[in-house]
A protein has these predicted regions:
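Hydrophobic alpha-helical bundle signature of multipass membrane enzymes
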Residues: 2-201, 211, 215-224
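Short, active-site-adjacent segments that bind or coordinate small-molecule cofactors and metal centers
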Residues: 208
């Protein structure tokens, strides 16, 4: 009796796909020293992404496709989310009479430290981007080719740096202006959704980014205030 193992072999091959074309300026960031935050990379929650061939990844691709068909934000909004994810939150924060302005919070160095930490995580997992595995699952998605090849998505997929930046900004803003926490988090969620709309991230990339903000980055920020 002949047994067809072609699908199993194909699954093994697709699971070997990683994102290997990280833009040099981003990979170099992983070697930088933190300026403000004290973060122990070895103590961060290490949760591996779904396998490329998994049913979970297929469901994630279906969610990407569905969002792309259902949500039609302006190009200006998508560009804004890509160019300045934390600014989406802090621009609003600065307009609502906060007790301390964002420029006094040392945002530049905080976001620099976030980028160092996130790129370390990305390089650790090396997760493929959605476009690399969509054909295997026979799910058609659109993706921003310029952003993916030479722009802000020229790194491994997991976790999402833009989502991490936006949610870190939202949590910092909420700490200083807690009565507007819902509004800050809503803005961060728009940034997270924009990365799925652009076809450059899986939903779980966003979920892991938020977990890292809550369990690593925000506690590190609060320690700087003591």
């Amino acid at each position: 009796m002949n047994v067809d193992f072609s699908q199993e072999i194909l699954a093994l091959e697709v699971d070997k796909i990683y994102f290997e074309n990280t833009k040099k300026e981003y990979s170099e960031q992983a070697k930088d020293n933190y300026k403000v935050l004290s973060i122990d990379f070895t103590k961060a929650p290490m949760i591996s992404p779904f396998k490329n061939s998994s049913l979970e990844t297929k469901k994630e691709l279906e969610k990407i496709s569905a969002l792309q068909n259902q949500w039609n934000p302006s190009k200006e909004l998508l560009m804004r989310c890509d160019d300045d994810p934390d600014g989406v939150v802090f621009d609003f924060y600065d307009k609502v009479n906060p007790p301390i302005k964002s420029k006094e919070i040392n945002i530049k160095d905080l976001m620099s430290d976030l980028n160092i930490f996130i790129i370390k995580m990305k390089m650790h997992f090396g997760r493929a981007r959605p476009f690399q595995v969509s054909d295997y699952h026979n799910i058609e998605i659109d993706y921003n080719k310029k952003m993916q090849k030479t722009g802000t998505a020229a790194t491994p997929s997991y976790p999402s740096g833009h989502t991490a930046a936006a949610y870190f900004a939202a949590e910092i803003a909420s700490h200083h202006k807690p009565q507007l926490e819902k509004e800050f988090l809503n803005l961060a969620n728009i940034v997270a959704l924009s990365r799925i709309k652009e076809g450059v991230h899986f939903p779980s990339d966003n979920e892991y980014a938020i977990k890292l903000v809550n369990e690593v980055l925000m506690p590190a920020y609060l320690r700087t205030l003591k």
